A protein has these predicted regions:
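Substrate-binding rim/cap in mid-to-C-terminal beta-strand-loop elements of soluble/periplasmic
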Residues: 127-133, 311-356
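Long, well-ordered early-domain segments
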Residues: 75-177
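Polar, surface-exposed loop/tail segments
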Residues: 358-377
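Active-site-proximal N-terminal segment of extracellular/periplasmic enzymes that hydrolyze or transfer
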Residues: 29-103
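Active-site His/acidic residue clusters
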Residues: 181-183, 230-276
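Bacterial N-terminal signal peptides
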Residues: 11-23
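Acidic, His- and aromatic-enriched active-site or binding-groove loops in soluble protein domains
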Residues: 132-145, 184-221
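Metal-dependent active-site segment of extracytoplasmic phospho-/sulfohydrolases and closely related
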Residues: 39-40, 48, 269-310, 352
Length: 377
């Protein structure tokens, strides 16, 4: 008779084996898509309101927005009477490139509504939902437990042509738990500590390691977004990953600190990081015209003069609302979606897989269908 540990090991191998077979079985469908690489980028806690209408005028002051620079200086950078111009000032790449060559979803003023499925609208549940395809999670907030759920990234890493080509980069240290570092075997750089390496660092890698070591992290050991970006760009050139998760967290950090001026600045920087990453990859033959970016957020926030600083349901209504931008060779250039559409954060996982020709729902029956952003082949 098998012992309990032995049976558990056999069961674990069977699960991984079935997941690998499911991934491999759907690999040939990838030939129908031009996308060979997918990058999921998250700007933490960015509201749909700022995404579609730019800066909130009622918060461009010290009393309610906690700003440190002068109101005149802040308005010069981020304000225009036209909301379409305001959003371009805040997110120039999203609106001048993604919205022209791809699609942007989630403008609730147009009846285009995106929401989380999980009942919490906090970070860990949001990252779990978008990466696993469902909102089931034994935590309701940000407890540092290793995620028991299988993510689409871990699943894709079992596909023969993608093994070792899936990586996670982010400023939040809990990505190690979200993507379950011990089990998933993904390359994960999360927070202010860098993963060990068996190879001698390049001069740039050595410099980055020194900068991580000598730069004070954010609260709770989170890294600066700029350091995440520089590390990611170096990894891109040395490891040539095909599937990436990228999480920038300063937008949420500054909102919780009540600094609306820094929320706007970090959102604009995040947009710049996305532009830089896109242009870098388009300049590399292995990525050019065969890479899709999905840009989104993990949750929304409260509204009004005070509650914009926080999120979570039911305490802060509106926290459940999200938005998504998609650009790539398999996404029609429909721009800002004006159709009455309702979509869920959970659809992102199957979308990542579908772009690469795989059916994630074969491994995770709880996952809904992909987002309606792919061209009909």
């Amino acid at each position: 008779m098998q012992t309990a540990p032995a049976i558990a090991r056999i069961a674990a191998w069977l699960v991984l084996g079935l997941a690998a077979l499911a991934a491999l079985a759907s690999t040939p469908a990838a030939a129908a898509n031009k996308t060979k690489n997918v990058v999921l980028i998250v700007l933490d806690g960015v509201r749909w309101q700022e995404t579609f209408t730019g800066a909130d005028e009622s918060l461009l002051n010290e009393k309610y927005g906690g700003i440190w620079e002068t109101e005149a200086a802040l308005r010069k950078r981020f304000w225009d009477a036209d909301p379409l111009r305001r959003r371009e000032l805040l997110f120039p790449f999203l609106w001048k490139v993604v919205a022209k060559q791809g699609q942007v979803l989630g403008n609730q003023k147009l009846g285009n509504i995106g929401q989380v499925s999980n009942p919490f609208a906090t970070s860990y549940p949001g990252y779990n939902e978008m990466s696993t395809g469902h909102g089931d999670l034994p935590v309701k907030d940000n407890e540092p437990i290793f995620n028991p759920n299988l993510s689409v990234f871990e699943w894709l890493n079992t596909r023969a042509d993608l093994t070792g080509k899936v990586a996670v980069f982010g400023s939040w240290q809990l990505y190690k738990q979200v993507f379950n570092t011990p089990r998933s075997h993904l390359y994960i750089q999360a927070g202010a500590s860098l993963p060990p390496t068996d190879t001698p660092p390049t001069p740039r890698q050595a410099l980055l390691r020194h900068m991580f070591k000598t730069t004070l992290p954010h609260e709770d050991g989170d890294a600066l977004d700029a350091l995440v970006q520089e590390s990611l760009l170096e990894y891109l050139h040395t490891a040539h990953p095909r599937v990436l998760f990228v999480g920038f967290g300063e937008t949420d950090d500054w909102a919780h600190s009540g600094r609306y001026d820094m929320v706007l600045a970090s959102a604009q920087h995040g947009d710049e990081f996305v532009r830089e990453l896109w242009e870098t990859m388009q300049a590399m033959p292995e990525y050019r015209d065969q890479t899709t970016f999905i840009i989104t957020t993990d949750h929304g926030r409260g509204s009004g003069l005070v509650d914009w600083k926080e999120h979570g349901t039911p305490e802060y209504p509106g926290s459940e609302n999200i938005w998504i931008g998609v650009i790539g060779p398999d996404t029609a250039p429909l721009g800002e979606r004006h159709d009455p559409l309702q979509f869920k954060q959970a659809q992102i996982a199957a979308t990542v897989a579908a772009l690469l020709g795989s059916d994630y729902r074969a491994a995770e029956p709880k996952a809904p269908e992909p987002l309606p952003v792919l061209r009909a082949n």
